[in-house]
Amino acid sequence: MNRLILKYGYPITALILAVFAWVIYVRISRGSQLTTLAVAAVIVWVLATPAFIYFWPRITVTGFKRAIVNRGFGGGPIPINTLYAEPKVSSGSASNASLLGAGTDDVLYVAGWLELRNGPLVLHTPDMAGRYYGVQFTDPSSSANFAYVGKRTTGTEAGDYLLSGPGWKGTLPNGMKQISSPNNSVLVIGRVFVKSDSDQPTAFALAQQIQLAPLNQ
């Protein structure tokens, strides 16, 4: 939803404002008077809509940080720079599902909140043997996904990825691919496909192997 707001919010707002302007122009050209309420409505729309488009995605991403760091997803708070893998798929019922996967019953979720101010982190992904998985990285200042690791982009073989913050000038270790974050804070959401109920333990074992470690460790 956040991506849709960012992509279409401003064009739709511009279209509605153009309609408002045309209506006002027509009324003035016909000698009609504009009511105070109509003028106030236009002013509120002009000011509030861009503010909503700008702040709402950032508020929702920050909500993930509070949920991850302060509450967790059933196993207690999750430390910063740590990934947590849900052991079971979320219920198909939105009322019983976790924050990560309302209505999604065929993937296990992995989540964490990262802070890169003290240096880069290394993301390790195991050999998924062709299984679908994905790890997306989100910039909380814009709610935009800036990188993706997974079957669709990097394949399913085991890999190590250096996640660095803005301005990092270190040396990339051999065999690693670099992911440059535009922000020192990063929201990470991962998914591992579950084929069936009997496959869930295998999928969970793989999800647990999606791990983070400091570069110097």
Regions found by a protein language model. Give the residues of each.
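Short, strongly hydrophobic alpha-helical membrane anchors
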Residues: 1-5
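A compositional/structural signature for long, glycine/proline-rich flexible linkers
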Residues: 8-217
